[in-house]
Amino acid sequence: MRRLVTGGAGCIGSDLAAALAARGDEVVVLDNLSSGKIEHLAGLLDRPGFRLIEGDLSDTAMVDAAMEGVEMVYHLAANPDVKFTPGEPTDKDLTQNTLCTYNVLEAMRRRGISKLAFSSTSAVYGIAASLPIPEDAPFPRPISLYGATKLACEGLISSFQHLFGMQAWIFRFANVVGPKVRRKGRTVIGDFIHRLRQDPTRLMILGDGNQAKSYLLSEECVAAMLFAVERAQEPLNIFNLGCDDWLSVHAIADMVVEAMGLEGVRYEFTGGEGGWPGDVPRFLLDVGRINRLGWKARHNSREAVGLAIEASLAARPAEARTGTACRP
């Protein structure tokens, strides 16, 4: 069977593409490589049945062409930055998330493709009244542009599913970490490692350090998606994906400092409950639905973060262990 993975050169997308290819599927990856990397697909490029298309989902003709012969779409492409930076265009998330999702759905409708798996986010919930939060919680009120546009994507998917007889799986991810998620500023782990490589004596931490969230390894996120697509067969299937525990930012800082072999690091907190405007300070997903289906993460949040730290440091072990400044 032929599968299309949008954003398939990204951290999660490339793991998904590899998993699909490993089980014998033909895989088409469509990625504009703005944040994804060809090297993430190094083991797939020469594989029979694999094809990489460098293109953007805003190009409707290219999206339509990429879907030729495809039987199912895994739509992971999106703006990867949850944090809004003042001065940036406010329509970036709308364009890259919602409008591009519409382009995917419309191309599927024209091509007669009925199955879609979509990577959503815990950010759609906003600040929950109680934790952990289940999939059927009261109507979400996101507090970030990223979360708002992902929620709009879910609405489009639900509408297309109902109107045009599609089948869809929506996955609301916890914070996903892994060996490919290393860019500074993209994750708290990458940010801490970068800062400590620049100055091993102090570490600036956004917020008060008490922010706590659930963390999931990329490979386990992919495994959960594939498991649910195989086992859950409602017309519209929505799952939280994560662990049943959480980890604080302060604890992650301690883990990074210890892994880098540093001592006496001074923590400097910027203050406030959240790390930035639109950040949800404390969040825990109720993962009972995916657990009852038969899937559970093998690693808890601390273990997932620990493995991600090890992988990040292994990329440049000499600089990382000594705290020597280096280029990001």
Residue ranges and their predicted role:
Residues 7, 16, 198-328:
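C-terminal substrate-binding subdomain of Rossmann-fold SDR/epimerase-dehydratase oxidoreductases
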Residues 130-132, 155-214, 218-227, 244-246, ...:
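NAD(P)-dependent short-chain dehydrogenase/reductase
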Residues 61-64, 71, 83, 91, ...:
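Residues in well-ordered alpha-helical elements
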Residues 38-41, 154, 190, 250, ...:
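Short, surface-exposed alpha-helical segments at coil->helix boundaries
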Residues 65-69, 107, 195, 224, ...:
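CheY-like receiver
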Residues 45, 77, 108, 196-200, ...:
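Hydrophobic aliphatic residues
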Residues 86-89, 145, 180-184, 279-281:
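Short, solvent-exposed loop/turn segments at secondary-structure boundaries
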Residues 1-176, 326-327:
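N-terminal Rossmann-like NAD(P)+-binding domain of SDR-like oxidoreductases, especially those catalyzing
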